[in-house]
Every structure is written in structure tokens, then in C-alpha cells.
């Protein structure tokens, strides 16, 4: 209690996500799950085509898999439309989304991912070092005196999903916007 009283002025009060950002987060995570399932069905269909000989069972499995993949594609499209509607309905989300997508290589999914995981860029108080560490973009080495040195590497607790999305965005920007 004494510690809390002494450091009360330094305390950062918790602020829950806004309603629209919480909904955006749920939609984004649901979309990721659907895309993962779609990918797994596509891989399984490809494996079945290679391993099974022509038979009525193979035909049935292939048709069923194709139907499931098409339904999952429709679901992803519905989610994408809902995400776009949600962003347009909130003024703050629209403003941030417009700014983020103005960066070459950053698309809708990259922008939504960044907005969701950084609480619409308010989570780190605009500190670039903290943001780079969280994204997994800032490698750090260990040095101690003259004998202990390690190569710089990214911490294992960095957000790998954001790092992967930003890497893909950078590759796309280099490829299409030299």
C-alpha cells in the first residue's frame, strides 16, 4: 500500500479497448482462424490428389473439400466486408487506417493487424524503440566487458505475426514500388 501511495503519480491507468476496436479485434482473429482452416483443407486436398488412385471415394472427398474451401472463401469475403464497414463507421479508426495504408506495401490486413495489436497505436505512447521491440524488428546483442559478445538477435517473445506481416509488406513495397 505504501509503494502504491508513493508511486501513484507514475501509475498508468488501464483503459479498455473502445467498442469498435474490440469488435475489429474479434473479426480479425476470426478471419485468421478461417484462413488457417482454409489453408489446411487446401493442403489436405492436394495431398489426397497425389496419394489416392481414381475411385468414387476420392471423387467424393475431392468434391467435399472443394465445397468446404469455397464456403471458407465466402466466409473470408464476408469478414473482409464487415471489417471495412466497421472501419468506415468509426471516425478514429478511419483516420488511422487511411494513414497506415498510405505507406507503400501496407494493405488492409497489415493495417488492421497493426491497429488491433497496438490498441490503435496508443499502446506504446508513440515510442519508436518500444514499438520496434514489440514488432520484433529491433535486434539486440549482449556485451559484457571484452570477452562476452553475442550476435544481435530478436527476442523470442516478439510478436511474430506482426513481424511476418511487416516483412511481407516490405518485400511487396520493394517489388512493386522501387
PLM features: residue spans?
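Long, charge-rich intrinsically disordered scaffolds of nucleic-acid metabolism proteins
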Residues: 1-99
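Phosphate-backbone recognition surface of nucleic-acid-processing proteins
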Residues: 102, 108, 112-178
